[in-house]
Amino acid sequence: EGLVGFEGDGANGVRRMTTRLLSGEFPKVRHLMDIKATRSVRARTDELINSVRRVSLVAERNTPLRMVINDDSVALSAATGDQAQASEAIEAVVTNHVDGEPTITAAGFNPHYLSDALGALDTPYVHFSFTAPGKPCLVTGLNDFDGKPETDYRHVIMLMRLPS
């Protein structure tokens, strides 16, 4: 009861998928997509993917990948105690959307979640929208570096708490 099945021929033969309709209410997530950024970062998607891949090699299972947001770059770093450390900086355009001191100067990401979000983008540039430490970050693609963020794919990542 409540099952739906799909079947089709593909390059690797016949594919079948069955799914079940769940009752209940889906969590309300629409408000997460309407983040009013206090600070945003734009960078090349491929550079960021490669940098995240290299730096996260030393991150342990629950260790956040730290993104330090500077005026014209972001620095990614990860460490495993005193045993291994990695850091790398890439060029970025950082925009403050509020007057005064930036509300967020560093963000902690789960390296796997960040890699998944970046890997799903099919645009040459990525746009991060930050609100405050510990609040969700919206990741979107950019076809033109100075253009508007794409709205066909949006990825929300909850930031991790960074150790002092």
Regions found by a protein language model. Give the residues of each.
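Extended macromolecule-engaging scaffold surfaces
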Residues: 1-164
